[in-house]
């Protein structure tokens, strides 16, 4: 268990960490939620990758129906958001949310990703 003061000290010293909560009963004999720190998942690309491409990929990660992955009865069917697919595919995938997308971000955002997050109000 890490108290809030220690978590703040760790995150301030090592900005690639973010505060997270492990829900009760995640592990055997763990009947209470536990606050701790973790390294969050980050999507990384080279700086020279096209801005519009990275903007589009970032948008597809968060917005359902933005892209088409499959056909149903011969017609294109809009796919769920990439984050929604991750939530179905992996237990930690449900923790990938737009609200926490920038938590623990210790490297500069690509201009395309920055544009998307600015549009969504995550960056002022």
Language-model features, listed with the residues they occupy:
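Short Gly/Pro-enriched loop/turn and capping motifs at secondary-structure junctions
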Residues: 48-50, 62-63
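Short amphipathic alpha-helical coupling segments at ligand-binding clamshell hinges
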Residues: 52-60
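Residue-level signal for nonpolar/aromatic packing positions in well-ordered secondary structure
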Residues: 57, 113-117
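Periplasmic-binding protein-like
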Residues: 61-97
